[in-house]
Amino acid sequence: MEMNLRIEDLNEETKTLISSLPSDKDFTGKTICKYQGCWYTHNVLQAVLNFQKSFKPQDTDIIVASFPKCGTTWLKALTFALLHRSKQPSHDDDHPLLSNNPHVLVPYFEIDLYLRSENPDLTKFSSSPRLFSTHVPSHTLQEGLKGSTCKIVYISRNVKDTLVSYWHFFTKKQTDEKIISSFEDTFEMFCRGVSIFGPFWDHVLSYWRGSLEDPNHVLFMKFEEMKAEPRDQIKKFAEFLGCPFTKEEEESGSVDEIIDLCSLRNLSSLEINKTGKLNSGRENKMFFRKGEVGDWKNYLTPEMENKIDMIIQEKLQNSGLKF
């Protein structure tokens, strides 16, 4: 997902900043540093700095935000399908989601666009609204948005399922198995808050508070609710985006068509997602695993469950947020 720049290939601003930041190793053995309360690899930190400095937001922009492995691919597909359904109905044989991975249609600021350039050419995003995505926490994102009133949709997920999916994804990503930590070691690091884009609880709370302070511009969604009540959740999402379903659309089955098109079952079965690759070389199939609620029960011991539950209870105390 990210280019592998050596430390000497980073610009001077980034190298100087890194030398002053707290650092640690993530569970793959990669050096990460803590900037504005969040852990980043050196490459991604440089991209975050580029984004904060150079991005020129438009008030019509839509940004999909998430902590890694919380349902980002699914939410990107839904966002694209909802916003483009008037010109590109979900039942069209040439719908872009049938031939493109959702991460191509909704690129990341810090992993795609600003990783490769300090000031990337965004003119190809000429249609309005422009669609972008990010894994950075809210306060870091807002610095790049410079007071814009664009809309942000955030997807959260139960911390235990997030951890399991996170470990599987980065284990598949890592080619040198000798430096992969065990699930138990990864669990301990995660509980300490040492994970790429972590700590998890700080990340989630940053967007939760944003949604309470400005519900017209920040929508906080939960993976579990989307799985349990897809029609209600997607209708609410469309309302937030400013493209609510008409009575005629609902009667014609448009909501269910979008649910089917964007389902993980359908997306993972597409040829582009079985054999295709992103520009980075990452295989599209890596973004699809189970997408289930409760898979953590196959991995966490009762002691692990109790420990992480106590941490989450403490970190989310008095916030009003529950999983």
Swiss-Prot record:
One of its GO terms (molecular function) is flavonoid sulfotransferase activity. It is an enzyme of class 2 (transferase). Induction: Up-regulated by trans-zeatin, but not by cold, heat, hypoxia, salt stress, auxins, gibberellins, wounding, etiolation and salicylic acid or methyl jasmonate treatments. The active site is at H135. Its EC number is 2.8.2.-. GO terms for cellular component: cytoplasm. GO terms for biological process: flavonoid metabolic process. InterPro entries: P-loop_NTPase, Sulfotransferase_dom. The keyword Transferase applies. 3'-phosphoadenylyl sulfate binds at K69, C70, G71, T72, T73, W74, R157, S165, R289, K290, G291. Expressed in inflorescence stems, roots and siliques. Its main location: cytoplasm. Keywords: Cytoplasm, Transferase. It is found in: Cytoplasm. Optimum pH is 7.5. Disulfide bonds: none annotated. It comes from the Eukaryota. Pfam families: Sulfotransfer_1. Sulfotransferase that utilizes 3'-phospho-5'-adenylyl sulfate (PAPS) as sulfonate donor to specifically catalyze the sulfate conjugation of flavones and flavonols. Strictly specific for the position 7. Substrate preference is kaempferol 3-sulfate > isorhamnetin > kaempferol. Belongs to the sulfotransferase 1 family. This is Cytosolic sulfotransferase 5. It comes from Arabidopsis thaliana (Mouse-ear cress).
